[in-house]
């Protein structure tokens, strides 16, 4: 009987590693995005189920306290590593050693066996996680979120390929992780094909959406709350402004749409909600200059990142949310939009093929030709019955992707990897 109890025991404390971006950061700014949301939502719900979570992240300011309580049972631990300030993500590998030292030093202040498991997010965190997990004698669970070989295979024009150090680091990480978490079946396939991961090493667990915050509501009221008149056709982009996310595709598509139907200009708004990020689109005026050159500056509205509650209003106000990314391991924005009852027009890439039910809750487009996006946008505006059909199905599709399911399935993985401690770590594979 004791063996059965050990096999099903829930770990008491998990060390989560989010080196390059803090869960306290506002999503949509810098390197903060869907991964930040994932770490926060999972940590909160793990704590509600009795699993304490410490999130280790790099300190970006000297005045940050060593520990900040994010929620009951969830602490964010700021680790000094390299100079303060926002650093280019590609330079952070140079500061792995002090970061790892800081993690080990923090753990050494506790009783032995303080952590039952390490969960790394992104390859940099995984590098630190490998060392910490082996030092503490606990399993390493790794979520890649994005992968270098996948990104390099679908670069936007002008984007730079991921560095060789990341390629080698990801190869090493896949070999050493006890369990890999893939967001979708497509990501699991990529882990096998590009990195040689074994089937039994991978667990496919889709991320979720907060269905209490992101829920349907009156479009007219939402338009008023964000300062737009009733009848506005809002084409919405949400995310970091970087080439990978391709906000320029939406602006070019809007120009093609207005060329096709000039009568739309008086009620069309292209909303870009998000902050500047890495990936080659750092010039503050790049999108506004593009809009001006295409003659659509009068309909383009660029807004900073919003709180979750405010963002939900943007989704509700939109006629359609456009996600034209070149690569996505999942596509949280697409799911949030659908949860609010707004259909999605997205690129047929990566996790977006799971996040969007093509022809049911949205439409997937092959490639990144603005004319193809313009054609689909025109249909959604010109055929309200078609858009209404998609909008009605969107919340139903999003409801299958709640965070409770994500955390339940992650807990199953954690249990398998932590019990019994006497077994080899490879047993959780």
From Swiss-Prot:
A molecular function GO annotation: D-inositol-3-phosphate glycosyltransferase activity
Protein keywords: Glycosyltransferase, Magnesium, Metal-binding, Transferase
UniProt catalytic activity: 1D-myo-inositol 3-phosphate + UDP-N-acetyl-alpha-D-glucosamine = 1D-myo-inositol 2-acetamido-2-deoxy-alpha-D-glucopyranoside 3-phosphate + UDP + H(+)
EC number per UniProt: 2.4.1.250
Residue positions binding Mg(2+): 315-316, 318, 342
UniProt-annotated binding residues for UDP-N-acetyl-alpha-D-glucosamine: 26-27, 34, 240, 245, 306, 328, 336
Biological role: Catalyzes the transfer of a N-acetyl-glucosamine moiety to 1D-myo-inositol 3-phosphate to produce 1D-myo-inositol 2-acetamido-2-deoxy-glucopyranoside 3-phosphate in the mycothiol biosynthesis pathway.
Family: Belongs to the glycosyltransferase group 1 family. MshA subfamily.
Descriptive protein name: D-inositol 3-phosphate glycosyltransferase
Source species: Nocardiopsis dassonvillei (strain ATCC 23218 / DSM 43111 / CIP 107115 / JCM 7437 / KCTC 9190 / NBRC 14626 / NCTC 10488 / NRRL B-5397 / IMRU 509) (Actinomadura dassonvillei)
Gene it is expressed from: mshA
């Amino acid at each position: 009987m004791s063996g059965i109890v050990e096999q099903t025991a829930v770990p008491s404390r998990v060390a989560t590693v989010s080196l390059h971006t803090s869960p306290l950061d506002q999503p949509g700014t810098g390197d903060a995005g869907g991964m930040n949301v994932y770490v926060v939502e999972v940590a909160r719900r793990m704590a509600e189920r009795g699993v304490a979570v410490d999130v280790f992240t790099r300190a970006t300011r000297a005045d940050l306290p060593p520990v900040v309580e994010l929620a009951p049972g969830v602490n964010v631990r700021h680790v000094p590593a390299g100079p303060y300030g926002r650093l280019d993500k590609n330079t952070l590998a140079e500061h792995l050693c002090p970061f790892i030292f800081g993690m080990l030093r923090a753990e050494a202040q506790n009783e032995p066996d303080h952590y039952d498991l390490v969960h790394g997010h992104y390859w940099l965190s995984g590098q630190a996680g490998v060392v910490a997990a082996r030092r503490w004698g606990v399993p390493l669970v790794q979520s890649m979120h994005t992968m270098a070989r996948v990104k390099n295979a679908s670069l936007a024009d002008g984007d730079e390929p991921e560095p060789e150090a990341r390629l080698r680091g990801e190869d090493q990480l896949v070999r050493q992780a006890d369990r890999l978490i893939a967001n979708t079946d497509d990501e699991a396939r990529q882990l096998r094909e590009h990195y040689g991961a074994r089937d039994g090493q991978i667990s496919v667990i889709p991320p979720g959406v907060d269905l209490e915050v992101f829920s349907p509501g009156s479009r007219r009221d939402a338009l008023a709350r964000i300062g737009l008149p009733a009848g506005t056709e809002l084409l919405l982009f949400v995310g970091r402004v970087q080439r990978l996310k391709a906000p320029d595709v939406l602006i070019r598509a809007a120009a093609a749409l207005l060329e096709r139907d000039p009568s739309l200009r008086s009620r069309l708004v292209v909303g870009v909600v998000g902050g500047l990020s890495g990936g080659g689109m750092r010039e503050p005026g790049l999108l506004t200059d593009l809009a001006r050159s295409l003659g659509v500056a009068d309909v383009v509205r660029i807004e900073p990142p919003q709180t979750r509650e405010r963002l939900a209003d943007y989704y509700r106000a939109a006629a359609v949310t456009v996600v034209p990314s070149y690569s996505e391991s999942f596509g949280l924005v697409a799911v949030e939009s659908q949860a609010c009852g707004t259909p999605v027009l997205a690129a047929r890439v990566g996790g977006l093929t799971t996040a969007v039910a093509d022809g049911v809750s949205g439409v997937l487009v092959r490639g990144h030709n603005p004319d193809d996006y313009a054609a689909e946008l025109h249909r959604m505006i010109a055929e309200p019955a078609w858009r209404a059909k998609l909008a009605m199905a969107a919340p139903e599709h999003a409801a299958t992707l709640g965070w409770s399911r994500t955390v339940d399935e992650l807990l199953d993985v954690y249990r398998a990897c932590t019990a019994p401690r006497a077994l080899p770590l490879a047993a959780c594979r």
